[in-house]
Every structure is written in structure tokens, then in C-alpha cells.
Amino acid sequence: MSTALLEARELSVRFGGLTAVDAVSAAFHEGELVGIIGPNGAGKTTFFNALSGVTAPTGGRLWVAGRDLTSAAAHHHARQGVARTFQTPRVFGELTVAANVDFGLQFGGRGRSGSRLLKDEASILRLIGLTDLAALPAAAVTPSQQRLLEIGMALATRPRVLLLDEVAAGLTEAEVEAMAQLIRRLRDDLGLAVVWIEHAVTTLLRHVERVLVLHQGRKIADDAPAAVVRDPTVIEAYLGDEMAEAAA
């Protein structure tokens, strides 16, 4: 297989005596759509923070497209093509929707080649379905639209890896399905490695090809969805029999 776009090798994050991420290894390749699930407090977001340079690992190594970025700050990760969203969308409420996307372009996108689908502000707004809201302040759009906008801002940096942290949280059932379809389109049309944390487990398992399961900071599974929902360790630690049956 080709060099991973993003690879964690025995990655750990400790806060004093608390180990939030415990020697997790995982590799993500171009065109992959990978889900990460686990109970609250499993270390999922902390793992994302380490992958994106927001939090410095305290052990292990982190490689981006073959470069060791273990100790690098978040902006170095972004310059190498790693973009992410957050559980609570981080948009500039006083700026227009279009200006938020333009911020992403100015930050990292203009100097890097990318798909024609990401060539400019208008193209990105069209891709995420916010063209008609371009002139509105970001604070004036709905929470679900702010989630889409944050994805647009991430795409504007023309990433190779897109890390999505609970982008379906708080959405209606129809909005969750629409979000999942958008995520698949981004993977299919842009060739990104997409890594998606989500508590809407049944939706996530329908759309990803591989699932990592974290529990108490450790990786307890890394396999196809069909295998994960039958894994006794995963069922005991997180899914339970009822959820496993629903997701199967």
C-alpha cells in the first residue's frame, strides 16, 4: 500500500497522571473513509487533537505524508494538508458565510493545487450547499449550516486529510443522512482521507469502510464495520447487544 497520508505510531497523550490516549497506532490513506467510535471519555477527540497538532503527543510518533510532525504546531499540520472540524463549530460569527470560506483560502488553500471543486469561494459554497447564504453573517445561520460552513472552511485549505469531529451532533435524522452523503461525496470526488468521529453509530457504520474503536484511551478494534459489530470486546465495552444488533 502507498505511504499513509496520516499515521500515528504508538501515539500517547497524558495529562499529569491521566492517560487520555494510550499507545494508539493507526494509518489513514488516500480515498479512505474511516470512522472512530467509542464511549464518552474514550479519548477520541484527544486523539484528533494530537493528529491535528492541537495537543502535543507525550509519546509515540506522528507522520503526515511521510514527514515526522510529532512535535509540530497545528499550523504546520494544516500546511501539510491536515484539516479538521470541532464538536462545536468554530466559525467567525461576525463575518459573512463567504468571508469565512475565504479565510480558509487565505490561510492555506491558495498556494496548493487541488480539485476544481475547491478552486474558489463560490465552488466551495456550492459543494457544501450554502451558496444562497453567502452574504449572511455566519452567526445568523442555523447550527447545522454552521457545521457545513466549518467543513467548507476546512476544505478551503485544500486538505489531503479531513478530520470530522461529531459533525452530525444535534442534527435531525434527515440532516444526519444528508451530512453522511456529503462526507461520502467529499471522499469520492476529492480523493481525501476522511476520518470521522461520531456518536450516531448506526449512520456512521453504514457509510464508512473501516472503524477504529477506542476505549479508555486504547484502540480495541480496527476493522470493517461488519466485523466490529460482532467483536465481543467492542460489544462489551461500548455497543452492547442491542446496539450491535441494530448496527449489524
What does each of the following model-derived ranges do?
Residues 2-248:
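Glycine-rich phosphate-binding loops of nucleotide-dependent enzymes
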